Regions:
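N-terminal auxiliary segments of SAM/dcSAM-dependent transferases
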Residues: 1-31
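General helical structural elements
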Residues: 20-23, 68, 94
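S-adenosylmethionine/decaboxylated-SAM
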Residues: 4, 8, 36-61, 72, ...
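N-terminal pre-P-loop "Q-motif" helix
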Residues: 62-67
Length: 247
């Protein structure tokens, strides 16, 4: 399929201040104002992937579309790496990404990390969520769905990130897309710092909920670590934060 991304007339492409402004506008402006949403909705692969994942996902449509655009049009521009998701809940977004990746990138795996038993104890001075939130993941049914779809590129990893991340990285080696969707500050912090050394040059760091009203703790991690400490600039702020990991 030919690209249906918008052409940003008068803009030059390339990396500036750690981000590709042109590509950020293509996706963000394209989805919000440029008619790109309708083109994604008409894309057969997007429709197929959403159809097999829709009953297990709570991700917003715009966020899902942006993830799809990254997979469909941008990952092949950077070095090969696997996909990791921190915070998979019922597995819908992981299924969606794995379905698309299986069609487009032979050999690429999606590692989906979650306790699959709900949130741990939270600091109510920082995070709005409570211990046990998202406890209805039902890992057994999720695995059955993965098996039925023959998504042998999707690896479900049960446990807290600090207990599983090292083993996952030993298997994966390189990551091209990190989808960080774990809502609370300690988990977002661990995810970012745990994946950063393994990101390929130009890899994508996507924060699903750091702009969500119930996840100010996640926002603080982005502000404190990525922006203030590490000096990163976002390539997108809508529909979610997207940063690049350049070497």
């Amino acid at each position: 399929m030919e690209s249906y991304l918008p052409i940003m007339n008068g803009m030059t492409t390339g990396i500036r201040q750690g981000r590709n402004v042109y590509e950020g506008y293509q996706r963000g402006w394209g989805l919000q104002f440029g008619g790109l949403r309708e083109k994604v909705l008409a894309d057969p692969l997007y429709r197929e992937a959403f159809a097999v994942a829709r009953d297990r996902t709570i991700m917003s449509e715009e966020n899902r579309m942006n993830i799809y655009l990254l997979l469909r049009f941008y990952l092949d521009k950077i070095p090969f790496g696997h996909i990791i998701e921190y915070g998979s809940y019922r597995g819908g977004s992981a299924i969606f990404m794995a379905y698309v990746a299986q069609k487009l990138y032979p050999g690429m795996k999606v590692f989906a990390l979650d306790s699959f038993e709900g949130m741990p104890q939270t600091d109510k001075n920082v995070d709005a969520h409570n211990a046990g939130d998202f406890g209805d993941a039902d890992l057994e049914k999720l695995q059955a769905r993965v098996d039925k779809l023959k998504l042998d590129n999707l690896v479900l990893v049960k446990g807290f990130f600090e207990d599983t991340n090292d083993d996952v990285m030993a298997q994966a080696g390189k990551i091209s897309l990190a989808h960080i969707d774990c809502d609370i500050a300690p988990a977002v912090k661990y995810s970012y710092e745990g994946v950063l050394p393994y990101m390929v040059d130009g890899g994508y760091l996507v924060f699903d909920d750091a702009t969500v009203s119930s996840c100010i703790g996640a926002t603080e991690v982005v502000e404190d670590l990525l922006i203030r400490r590490d000096g990163l600039n976002s390539e997108q702020i809508w529909p979610h934060f997207v940063f690049r990991a350049f070497k």
